[in-house]
Amino acid sequence: MLVLKRKTGEAIQIGDDIELTILAIEGDQVKLGIHAPRQIDIHRKEIYLAIQDENAEASQSTGLMSQLLKQRTDS
């Protein structure tokens, strides 16, 4: 893991397309501004993990539905 120190108003560049700017530091919270192309999804980590869990559940449900439909058409 790369660890960098930045002050309010300073930025970090990731590749050619993503810029993170420190907007404010308030106690133990850091407010970030993110400039990135629209096609790049940006989520808080807990939201990203919840989306991954829901996608995994949905794909399992789709597999089950396919099996049920196959059983019905085979009968």
Curated annotation (Swiss-Prot):
It comes from Exiguobacterium sibiricum (strain DSM 17290 / CCUG 55495 / CIP 109462 / JCM 13490 / 255-15). One of its GO terms (cellular component) is cytosol. The gene is csrA. InterPro entries: CsrA, CsrA_sf. Belongs to the CsrA/RsmA family. This is Translational regulator CsrA. Disulfide bonds: none annotated. SUPFAM superfamilies: CsrA-like (SSF117130). It comes from the Bacteria. GO terms for molecular function: mRNA 5'-UTR binding. Keywords: Bacterial flagellum biogenesis, Cytoplasm, Repressor, RNA-binding, Translation regulation. NCBIfam families: csrA, PRK01712.1. Transmembrane segments: none annotated.
